[in-house]
């Protein structure tokens, strides 16, 4: 099992000391990756429902570091950590510029980028960015992935599509990773599974939250759907990685009850949950250890590394 953790893009830890401190500490502890989320602006009036909160409200009030800039900084401050966008909202940015930025970070990090992608949920943010039509975001995202793969190939290349066009161009340097950095798709909807099956190298859903529990039986059913879809596209279904993002709730004593949410409870229960999802095919788990202070955050990382990660890495 490989383990990653969330870097702060907002709040009191979203500083140079906070981001770099967490990244370097995690690398020393043996974590394999860091993730960072993507928002550019938060309009003052948002009616769109955040899909991972029971009340539909997103926790940010507008503070959000730009994710690719943040990961470029972390690339220079670390040597081994994989750098994962979790997730990059594809329609928010020009696809040619995005391809160039991702390739540049991959070159400077010596091949450590994983591009986690999503289609977005906040209509108001799309409008503020003058992004493509929110209701076409799925089709736009699919086309942008195709553009990325072209631009990450030896040129010249061109693209004549529904949502974007360009004539013959070269876009170099190419990414270090060939044929391209791994692409993981976030989300657990049918369109997200289809997008993963057709285009991606990994499935990267959030789980163990009230609106997306993804308990073992549900996760297994979605995994099976994904693999059937992949076969339908002529792909090896087992070539698609399963990278789960559960919410973590640690307690000093075991949590009782049949309705206990996975990754809630004592160290022994967390270890059991790791093994359960490993048996389902999950090879990467990412957690959010952020606390009120950097000291408390690093202590949480220490605890998990010694009490759970060290006992489940094999």
What are these regions (language model features)?
Residues 1-314:
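Active-site-adjacent structural elements that line small-molecule/cofactor binding pockets in enzymes
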């Amino acid at each position: 099992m490989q383990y990653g953790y969330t870097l702060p893009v907002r709040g009191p830890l979203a500083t140079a000391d906070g981001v770099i401190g967490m990244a370097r500490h995690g690398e020393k502890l043996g974590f394999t990756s860091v993730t960072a989320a993507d928002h550019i602006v938060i309009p003052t009036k948002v009616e769109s429902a955040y899909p991972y909160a029971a009340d539909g409200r997103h926790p940010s009030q507008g503070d959000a570091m730009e994710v690719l800039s943040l990961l470029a900084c972390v690339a220079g401050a670390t040597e081994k950590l994989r750098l994962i966008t979790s997730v990059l909202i594809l329609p928010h940015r020009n696809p040619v510029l995005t391809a160039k930025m991702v390739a540049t970070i991959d070159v400077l990090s010596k091949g450590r980028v994983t591009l986690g992608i999503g289609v977005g949920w906040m209509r108001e943010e799309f409008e503020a960015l003058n992004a493509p039509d929110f209701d076409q975001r799925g089709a736009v995202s699919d086309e942008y992935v195709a553009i990325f793969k072209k631009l990450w190939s030896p040129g010249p290349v061109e693209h004549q599509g529904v949502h974007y066009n360009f004539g013959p161009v070269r876009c170099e340097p190419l990414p270090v990773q060939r044929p391209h950095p791994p692409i993981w798709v976030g989300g657990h909807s049918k369109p997200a599974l289809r997008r993963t099956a057709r285009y991606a190298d990994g499935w990267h859903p959030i789980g163990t939250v009230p609106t997306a529990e993804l308990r073992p039986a549900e996760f297994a059913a979605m995994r099976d759907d994904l693999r059937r879809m992949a076969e339908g596209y002529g792909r090896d279904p087992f070539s698609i990685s399963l990278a789960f993002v559960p919410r973590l709730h640690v307690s000093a004593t075991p949590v009782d009850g049949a309705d206990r949410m996975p990754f809630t409870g004592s160290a022994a229960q967390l270890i059991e949950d790791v093994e359960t999802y490993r048996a389902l095919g999950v090879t990467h788990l990412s957690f959010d250890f952020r606390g009120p202070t950097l000291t408390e955050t690093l202590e949480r990382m220490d605890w998990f590394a010694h009490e759970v990660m060290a006992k489940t890495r094999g």
